[in-house]
Curated annotation (Swiss-Prot):
Alphabetized UniProt keyword annotations: Disulfide bond, Hydrolase, Protease, Serine protease, Signal, Zymogen
Name of the protein: Mast cell protease 2
InterPro entries: Peptidase_S1_PA, Peptidase_S1_PA_chymotrypsin, Peptidase_S1A, Trypsin_dom, TRYPSIN_HIS, TRYPSIN_SER
Propeptide: 19-20
GO cellular component: extracellular space
Example GO molecular function: serine-type endopeptidase activity
Domain Peptidase S1: 21-244
Length: 247
């Protein structure tokens, strides 16, 4: 039951319910050039949003639960209400969901998006490095999440990119999450502070020392930390294999 509540708390974007930034601040415009804003049309025709991040000129990494009938990626954005000159809007050619993804324990919540064309790298649009397969981020590390998600449980999603600093927790802090698995997931956010990713932030990155170690996956419906992020290092071989065969 709790796993289902968690899933409801961050199943997709603004309008369907996905992670967002609570307790954070507005980002300096274009200071996170790898950030991707995903405009999604679901199989039911709903329009929702997720986050993602650019890892090569033609691939964006995000959460598998951000899948949809159609996805358009906006790169180089800060305020998504505006047609900023820095923005590059590209449709997704192919959604590649991890073959072991299961929405009920929400394991392997990772997806690659192949863009219809390669992006132009600029000061506002650039890739972010991934960890090595053996590089596990450890408890106590301070990392950053960013996104255009909700800024409060009852608030709308943000038009401008926001970010929040979060602590990596020991796996014991996520004991309430029945299906949490250390090898595949990261326990993120101190329960003593209300700082979190929330609805609309799903699929966005967790940056530790400039490296994308996590993907916003799911959390409690009231946004109380900690939350669960997909552990990127575990999936680096899969990511590389997909890119090599799909390029």
């Amino acid at each position: 039951m709790q796993a289902l509540l968690f899933l409801m708390a961050l199943l997709l974007p603004s309008g369907a319910g996905a992670e967002e930034i609570i307790g954070g601040v507005e980002s300096i415009p274009h200071s996170r050039p790898y950030m991707a804003h995903l405009d999604i049309v679901t199989e039911k025709g709903l329009r929702v949003i997720c986050g993602g991040f650019l890892i090569s000129r033609q691939f964006v990494l995000t959460a598998a639960h951000c899948k949809g009938r159609e996805i358009t990626v906006i790169l180089g954005a800060h305020d998504v209400r505006k047609r900023e000159s820095t923005q590059q809007k590209i449709k997704v050619e192919k959604q590649i969901i991890h073959e072991s993804y299961n929405s009920v324990p929400n394991l392997h919540d990772i997806m690659l998006l192949k863009l219809e064309k390669k992006v132009e790298l600029t000061p506002a649009v650039n890739v972010v490095p991934l960890p090595s397969p053996s590089d596990f981020i450890h408890p106590g590390a301070m990392c950053w999440a960013a996104g255009w998600g909700k800024t409060g449980v009852r608030d709308p999603t943000s038009y401008t990119l926001r970010e929040v600093e979060l602590r990596i927790m020991d796996e014991k802090a996520c004991v309430d999450y029945r299906y949490y698995e250390y090898k595949f997931q990261v326990c993120v956010g101190s329960p003593t502070t209300l700082r979190a990713a929330f609805m609309g932030d799903s699929g966005g990155p967790l940056l530790c020392a400039g490296v994308a170690h996590g993907i916003v996956s799911y959390g409690h419906p009231d946004a109380k930390p900690p939350a669960i992020f997909t552990r990127v290092s575990t999936y680096v071989p899969w990511i590389n294999a997909v890119i090599n065969t799909s390029s």
